[in-house]
Amino acid sequence: MAKLLSFSDESRGALEKGVNNLANALKVTIGPKGRNVVIEKKFGAPDIVNDGVTIAKEIDLEDPFENIGAKLIEQVASKTKEKAGDGTTTATVLAQFMVQEGLRNTAAGASPIELRRGMEKAVAQIVDDLKKKSKSVSGDAIKQVATVSAGGDEEIGSMIADAIDKVSFDGVITVEESKSLATELDITEGMAFDRGYSSPYFVTDEDRLICEFENPSILITDKKISSIADLIPVLETVQKNGTPLIILAEEVEGEALATLVVNKNRGVLQVAAVRAPSFGERRKAALGDIAVLTGGTLISEDKAMSLEKVQISDLGQARRVTITKDSTTIVANEAQNTELSNRIASIKRELEETDSEYDQEKLNERIAKLAGGVAVIKVGAPTETELKNRKLRIEDALNATRAAIEEGIVAGGGTTLLELSEGLGDLAKKLEGDQKTGVEIIKRALTAPTKQIAINAGFNGDVVVSDIKRLGKGFNAQTGEYEDLLEAGILDASKVIRLALQDAVSIASLLITTEVVIADKPEPPSAPGAEGGDPMGGMGGMGGMGGMGGMGGMGMPGMM
């Protein structure tokens, strides 16, 4: 494919336009009085969302160079979301300011390399100062962090605090859509472990990069599966029943994995493969725990059991299974209480008999996973559009709460960044030239989130920042009052603030040191009637896998 090249100020100018287009769409959502963004969908009703990363993923700009700038800022939002679960809009607002100021100074003759060094030194100091300022989470702080992250919704804050209280900080909390209008908290049997899908092609929700099935069957085995022939009987059974299948095995690889992926993508099967947790004998124990939890049978080599002879009664059942790239959560049905109690009692007897501290730790972990249960927040709303928006808010609030538990809390509303910016004056005095300018860029950038929160609430951002410095108090955008935000319960998770700042400066420093941009040359519009050719042609490439196992000849006419 032919490429387009852009150089120097022209290239940086195009990148900046892309950054501004995306950032301007995102920053209207920040703060308790942030606005919504309406996103048109090809099919169905439009989405109305308040979630930064969801908005960012929907934006594609016509100009290829501007689109690269937009995608770099989308990367800021996505990285912050992935690592902290919240703070995407804060990261975007910071990155936009840093890019604008950095490019303005570069155009005036500043060295982009020296600017970057100064910016990185400033951020390193802010991160150190942030750690010193953080306070551990206690009392009502959990509810307050969740409430702030949910856009001031106290019902959500209370529900998340209640969920953590019931399943502990280390417990599993999931969010699902309710069939009623009410949002409810349900505690049920379940388990989570740190293994994800065997292939990203099993993803069913591309926005969240997860694979999620309702009421799936679960094949549980300690075997390594490489031949599709081993799976044909069970695949035929679940295909006839229309039931999703989760294959939990030591490894699914080669021909078996490729065939499952192709049939899943063609819509023939609802299937996903997951690597079994732990190693060696502990893996068998963990799989045994999952078998008891789901009412299934562990198909084990030790018992001389064969995958070809698996019956539907050997498969485990779950209410819901959610799989990410590195974790799996099983929400169990409620029919296994007796077997579960017996399993826990058996593990406790093992615990009493062992003297090894390591074994005791692992056995206690197994008990906690089986006994702790899963807190399920069932989200209800009058319309599907509101339901999606509310679900995103709850997920953000839950992620922010977990981040607060990890690294502590600070005053919210952008106030902490504003306070920490004052400490950069001493650092700037120690530096000179463009490095000093880089520090000053970060100092000014740290005021940007507070300004935008104030603007979204209908106030003058510059006046609010000036008043905060003069009064020594934070700005409560919900009430329009100046007060101690820690006492008022307006809190941010330190981890969210730290990652937003680090991710923002990472992308901004790359952008201001860019000299050449290379983009794909847009293809001319297709002739009328030819539009369907390319997509179908691309699918045809998968047909080459049809010889992989010859499933049609093995009793699976509907597959491959």
Curated annotation (Swiss-Prot):
Gene: groEL2
Matches recorded under InterPro entries: Chaperonin_Cpn60_CS, Cpn60/GroEL, Cpn60/GroEL/TCP-1, GroEL-like_apical_dom_sf, GROEL-like_equatorial_sf, TCP-1-like_intermed_sf
GO process terms (BP): protein refolding
Reaction(s) this enzyme catalyzes, per UniProt: ATP + H2O + a folded polypeptide = ADP + phosphate + an unfolded polypeptide
Similarity comment: Belongs to the chaperonin (HSP60) family.
Functional description taken from the UniProt entry: Together with its co-chaperonin GroES, plays an essential role in assisting protein folding. The GroEL-GroES system forms a nano-cage that allows encapsulation of the non-native substrate proteins and provides a physical environment optimized to promote and accelerate protein folding.
Record's protein name: Chaperonin GroEL 2
Gene3D superfamilies, alphabetized: GroEL, GroEL-like equatorial domain, TCP-1-like chaperonin intermediate domain
Gene Ontology annotations for the cellular component aspect, listed alphabetically: cytoplasm
Primary localization class, coarse: cytoplasm
